[in-house]
Every structure is written in C-alpha cells, then in structure tokens.
C-alpha cells in the first residue's frame, strides 16, 4: 500500500466510531427534504434514505425479476450500506475499505444482523481492487472518493469491476462546476483544503470532473445532480450536538483527540455549503453492454 493511502487507513482506524452517535453504522451523509429541521430522532432514517435515493436515481430496480444479483460498496466503512442492501434486495454484497478496523467491525455487524453469508468485507486499496473484471451488478461509492488522490483511476477501477449493464453510483462532497478556463478563487480553495484536512480527505473535484472521467469509458446514460440542499439540514444539528457534553465526550472517547478536527471541519462545511463553495454531487451511469 502506498504511503499516502496508509495515512488514510490510519486516519479511519483512529476515528472509526467517533460519529456513530449521529450516523450509526453509516459513515455517510443523510438525505433530507430541503428545509427540514434535522433531529437526532430522524438522522438514522436519513442515512438509510440516502442509500434508497441513490439507488433510485441510478435506476436500480426493486422488481425481483430485474433486481441486481450483487453489489460492491467502495469505501464500505462500518458495513451499514452492504448489510442494508443485502437485506432489502436479498443479494450478495461486498465491501472494500482501506481500514482493517472497519473490516473487523463490519464483519461483526453483519454477523449480528444475520447476513454474514450474504455480505463480505475486504481490506484493500480502491485504486487496485482484488476483483475480476465485470463482477458486480451495482458498483456504489459515497463519501469515499474525497479521500483518494487519483480520483480518475478510482473511477476506472469502479467501471472495470462493473458488469455489463451495471449501475455505477458516485456520491461525494465536491466543489462547484467551473467554466472552461475558470479556477477556484484562492480564498475558496483555502477553505476547501481546510475542510479536507479536518475530515481526513485529500481533495475535492466537481461533478463535471466525474462526468469527464466517465465519458471515455464504456459507460452510458451518465447523469449528474446537485443534492446539496438535501444534506445541509444535518449541519445545524451536528454543530449543536457536537458541543453538548454527550456529543463531545462520545466523539473524543471513540475517536480520540484527533476527532476534534472533525468538529472544527463541520463548522467550515456548514458555512461553505451555505456560501455555495461546497456541493454534494451525485453522478451515475450504466456500464455498456
């Protein structure tokens, strides 16, 4: 494993569990109706809804006769997405993460949910995945590509392991789309890098970048959407709860003092999203037959 990727693995090994008060076993953003007032009571439902909305947007059928037979979650975290999809669709799900601690947690979680025979997790590099070409009917990633240096290679690997006709789903934090010749303002670039540093991410790109990297590959029906308004309702809740005694101690006890950087990053994320310099991009396509 390259040194850069080892640092990502180390980060996740140290902060795994720090945010489970808000996300449970789903280390990704939730989906809210714009203008919703997020509460702790609905935050778990929102992360589940995000999975459903992404699959729906990508055209993944729930019809038993047309449903996928297998799914790969790239950057599978604590295993929440794989376990949920395996149960909902009654299919085989595989997760890959660079964090050994997350693999162990995910395996234990799958066992407690009774789907250990339908779900498996591998510790590996998303830039060089240990899977054969055309293996999976759905290839899914959310809030992962931000942590990868070579994002174009990441996408090529996703497409490589996707079966003909497979849905390919990419969802991530992103910067705004830019016109030809346009670049991020130095101030905005600095703010986004501070967010990345606090969240253990490497860099952000735009949804146009994802589309540009997918276009020369054997992928059709490429479409993109901006779901920023659907994730921002959570930010006020995160800022409020993270500074309660319960929230603060949960984050520090489970994630260590390094997790404090995540709290600071939340402040920046909320403001950047409000100012329009941070987006939540969704891009999907279908592997050509």
UniProtKB/Swiss-Prot annotation:
Annotated region (SAM motif I), positions in chain: 71-80
Cellular component GO terms held in the UniProt record: peroxisome; thylakoid
Chain residue ranges for the region called SAM motif III: 161-170
Pathway(s) it belongs to: Alkaloid biosynthesis; vindoline biosynthesis
GO BP field: alkaloid metabolic process; methylation
Sequence motif Microbody targeting signal, location on chain: 287-289
Catalytic activities: (3R)-3-hydroxy-16-methoxy-2,3-dihydrotabersonine + S-adenosyl-L-methionine = deacetoxyvindoline + S-adenosyl-L-homocysteine + H(+)
Pfam families in UniProt: Methyltransf_11 (PF08241)
Domain of life where this protein originates: Eukaryota
Enzyme kind, highest EC tier: transferase
Tissue expr: Mainly expressed in young leaves, and, to a lower extent, in mature leaves, flowers, stems and roots (at protein level).
Intracellular or extracellular location(s): Thylakoid; Peroxisome
Record keyword Signal present: no
Activity regulation information from UniProt: Inhibited by gamma-tocopherol.
InterPro entries the record matches: Erg6_SMT_methyltransf (IPR050447), Methyltransf_11 (IPR013216), MTs_g-TMT (IPR025774), SAM-dependent_MTases_sf (IPR029063)
Sequence segments annotated as region (SAM motif II): 134-142
Keyword Ligase carried by entry: no
Principal place of residence: other
Keyword list, A-Z: Alkaloid metabolism, Methyltransferase, Peroxisome, S-adenosyl-L-methionine, Thylakoid, Transferase
Induction info: Up-regulated upon methyl jasmonate treatment.
GO molecular function list: 16-methoxy-2,3-dihydro-3-hydroxytabersonine N-methyltransferase activity; N-methyltransferase activity
Job description of the protein: S-adenosyl-L-methionine-dependent N-methyltransferase that catalyzes a nitrogen methylation involved in vindoline biosynthesis. Displays a strict requirement for a 2,3-dihydro bond in the aspidosperma skeleton. Can use 2,3-dihydrotabersonine, 2,3-dihydro-3-hydroxytabersonine and 2,3,6,7-tetraydro-3-hydroxytabersonine as substrates, but not tabersonine, vincadifformine, 21-hydroxycyclolochnericine, tryptamine, norharmane, harmaline, catharanthine, norajmaline, ajmaline, serpentine, ajmalicine, yohimbine or gamma-tocopherol. Inactive with picrinine as substrate.
Complex and partners: Homodimer.
Record's protein name: 3-hydroxy-16-methoxy-2,3-dihydrotabersonine N-methyltransferase
Record organism: Catharanthus roseus (Madagascar periwinkle)
Gene behind this protein: NMT
